UniProtKB/Swiss-Prot annotation:
<dbReference type="GO" id="GO:0048366">
    <property type="term" value="P:leaf development"/>
</dbReference>
<keyword id="KW-0732">Signal</keyword>
<keyword id="KW-0472">Membrane</keyword>
<dbReference type="InterPro" id="IPR009606">
    <property type="entry name" value="DEAL/Modifying_wall_lignin1/2"/>
</dbReference>
<keyword id="KW-0256">Endoplasmic reticulum</keyword>
<feature type="transmembrane region" description="Helical">
    <location>
        <begin position="56"/>
        <end position="76"/>
    </location>
</feature>
<dbReference type="GO" id="GO:0005789">
    <property type="term" value="C:endoplasmic reticulum membrane"/>
</dbReference>
<dbReference type="InterPro" id="IPR052222">
    <property type="entry name" value="DESIGUAL"/>
</dbReference>
<comment type="function">
    <text>Involved, partially redundantly with VCC/DEAL1 and DEAL3, to ensure bilateral symmetry development and early leaf margin patterning, probably via the regulation of auxin and CUC2 distribution.</text>
</comment>
<feature type="signal peptide">
    <location>
        <begin position="1"/>
        <end position="20"/>
    </location>
</feature>
<keyword id="KW-1133">Transmembrane helix</keyword>
<protein>
    <recommendedName>
        <fullName>Protein DESIGUAL 2</fullName>
    </recommendedName>
</protein>
<dbReference type="Pfam" id="PF06749">
    <property type="entry name" value="DUF1218"/>
</dbReference>
<feature type="transmembrane region" description="Helical">
    <location>
        <begin position="94"/>
        <end position="114"/>
    </location>
</feature>
<comment type="similarity">
    <text>Belongs to the DESIGUAL family.</text>
</comment>
<keyword id="KW-0217">Developmental protein</keyword>
<feature type="transmembrane region" description="Helical">
    <location>
        <begin position="133"/>
        <end position="153"/>
    </location>
</feature>
Length: 168
């Protein structure tokens, strides 16, 4: 039963991240459909409410996937570099995956927020254009999904190793 729950959680994390990625790319497509005037490196364009909604939904799903992976994956405590080097391969993989998920979350979330806020109804942008910010944020959501699932699997495996070593 526990393996079925773990499989379901992995599918849930992947589904949220893939959905966030698709929404980020769809937001970029919706943003490109809005009329704009380009002069040299400056660009004036109207905001796209559809791109705003898709970008906001992508941000929410990305954060939910991250929170799900971190809370359900458990807490790994590593006090020092020597402690990390002595730990099992599962724990080392979990720590590396955790670090990468946080880095990717920070970059993807920032890009999605910048693209989403550029499409807020209260803004008519004139300035240096931010091309492909939403689509790059969406692509990073896919990468986040891979590392989040790797973290969840390795963290739960590491926890099982520690509990079975404690009973032996």
């Amino acid at each position: 039963m526990a393996r079925n729950v773990g499989f379901f959680i992995c599918i849930l994390i992947l589904a949220m991240d893939v959905s966030a990625g698709i929404l980020g790319i769809e937001a970029e497509i919706a943003q490109n459909k809005v009329k704009h005037l380009k002069m040299w490196i400056f660009e004036c364009r109207d905001p796209s409410y559809t791109a705003f909604k898709y970008g906001l939904a992508a941000c929410i799903l990305l954060v939910l996937a991250h929170v799900t992976a971190n809370f359900l994956g458990g807490c790994l405590c590593v006090a020092s570099r020597q402690d990390l080097e002595k730990s099992s391969a599962n724990k080392q993989l979990a720590v590396a995956s955790l670090i990468f998920t946080w880095i990717i979350l920070a970059i993807a979330f920032s890009m999605l927020i910048v693209g989403t806020m550029a499409n807020s109804r209260s803004r008519k942008n004139c300035g240096i254009s931010h091309h492909r910010v939403l689509s790059i944020g969406g692509i990073l959501c896919f990468v986040h999904g891979l590392f989040a699932v790797a973290y969840y699997i390795s963290a739960t495996a590491s926890t099982r190793e520690q509990t079975s070593a404690g009973h032996a």
